[in-house]
Amino acid sequence: MKALIVFVKAPVAGKVKTRLQPHLSPDKIVELYKSFVTEIISKCNRLKEVDKFLGCAPTRDNNFLRELTTTYKLKSFDQKGKNLGEKIINAFQDHFKKGYKEIVLIGSDSPTIPIGYVKEAFLKLKKNDFVIGPCCDGGLYLVGAKKKIISEIFQDMPWDTSEVLNKTLK
């Protein structure tokens, strides 16, 4: 069984895409973020033979997130953990326990991601235990694993910096 997890945040003014605030109002940022999330979910929904999940922060108890799960027939769960690394580890471990053998996780920051990148990640998991999608800014847009996640990879990670990719590869 395969699972695709998309990490999303509840679209609350002042809580999403905060680095855009000097340029856009909090309400405009929320609308932009909703568009990002809707676009990426719409693309992911085209994948066949993959169960799709929304990993929601801080909770899935949000009208927009409920609407997405209903419209696109997704399953959802609340992210668990103190930082992004713990949230990623917990999402993978919980879904491996449910019987999933191949899991790919993406964020909602890349609405223009070609869906072929996600398909390619699943293909690479047939021969590899772990895959990543590197960003040009030194971060990651995708993490995939087969059968287990190596939690040490995500511990003491300097999230939201240009060092994530380098530290992941070490």
Predicted regions and their residues:
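A short, N-terminal amphipathic alpha-helix
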Residues: 33-50
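Short beta-strand/loop segment that forms part of the nucleotide-sugar
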Residues: 49-58
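Active-site oxyanion/phosphate-handling segment shared across diverse enzymes
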Residues: 149-170
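Short aromatic-hydrophobic micro-motifs that form the base-stacking/packing surface
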Residues: 104-106
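Conserved donor-nucleotide/metal-binding helix-loop-beta segment in metal-dependent transferases, i.e.
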Residues: 111-138
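Active-site rim beta-loop-alpha module in soluble metabolic enzymes
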Residues: 135, 145-147
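N-terminal nucleotide-binding beta1-loop-alpha1 segment
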Residues: 1-19
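Short phosphate-binding loop-to-helix
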Residues: 66-102, 161
